[in-house]
Design a protein with these regions (language model features):
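Short active-site segment of divalent metal-dependent hydrolases/proteases
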Residues: 75-83
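Long, well-structured alpha-helical subdomains associated
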Residues: 118-192
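Acidic/histidine-rich, surface-exposed loop or edge segments in extracytoplasmic proteins
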Residues: 2-7
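Short pre-active-site segment immediately N-terminal to the catalytic Zn-binding motif
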Residues: 58-74, 98-100
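Zn2+-dependent metallopeptidase catalytic core
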Residues: 12-32
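Post-HEXXH active-site segment of zinc metalloproteases
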Residues: 72, 84-118, 127
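Catalytic zinc-binding patch centered on the HExxH motif and its immediate surroundings
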Residues: 26, 32-59
């Protein structure tokens, strides 16, 4: 999927960041056939904007902080584009179509995590969760993603699905932390 870089981003974009953006865009089929402008920001982790003229989306823009860039941030900003695009038609109610991603930061985090495990590399910013879950995110990421998927399913019948999700997150924090096997750094024997 093609994307355009702003002059500031051209100066700062690393190979790693370019690869991350390209890989993330592949997981957003809703954005196929559009050109996304990728800009640079210093203030926030990221931001997303849709420029409309006479009710037509003219430009889709995301701005990212290249330093400490995560898939979660890229996915979050791309999900904002989907939110804005879905709600661009102001003639109908925003809640009219349950298949659309609802507007809001917390909703954006939920839909981003549910989209693909790739976006679980860093804890979300807006979902309220216990400190232990945030601090030991790699141990909890898969469980949180499953809960986000369940929360989206619950949304059709349960109006307070975000509260349900946050309650479930508090429950998993009380259970002993799951141990995810990760290869430790290779230790070489010290020989004198």
């Amino acid at each position: 999927m093609p994307f355009r870089l702003t002059p500031q981003m051209k100066q700062r974009l690393t190979r790693r960041a370019r690869d991350m953006i390209e890989r993330s865009l592949q997981l957003f089929p809703e954005l196929q056939g559009t050109i996304i402008t990728v800009g640079y920001t210093r203030k926030h982790l990221g931001s997303a904007t849709i420029v409309y003229r006479k009710g037509i989306a003219m430009r889709l823009i995301i701005r990212l902080k290249v330093r400490k860039l995560t898939y979660q941030t890229i996915g979050h900003e791309l999900t904002h584009l989907i939110q804005g695009w879905a709600h661009g038609d102001r003639s109908r109610s925003r809640a009219a179509d349950p298949a659309k991603v609802p507007s809001g930061e917390t909703q954006c985090d939920i839909w981003t995590l549910a989209r693909d495990p790739l976006f679980c590399d860093d804890p979300p910013t807006y979902i309220k969760m216990p400190r232990v879950v945030r601090e030991h995110w790699p141990d909890y990421a898969a469980q949180v993603r499953k809960l986000c998927i369940a929360a989206i399913e619950k949304r059709h019948t349960h109006r307070l699905y975000i509260r349900w999700l946050e309650d479930e997150l508090h429950k998993i924090a009380k259970i002993e932390r799951p141990k995810i096997f990760q290869a430790d750094q290779l230790l070489l024997p010290f020989v004198i």
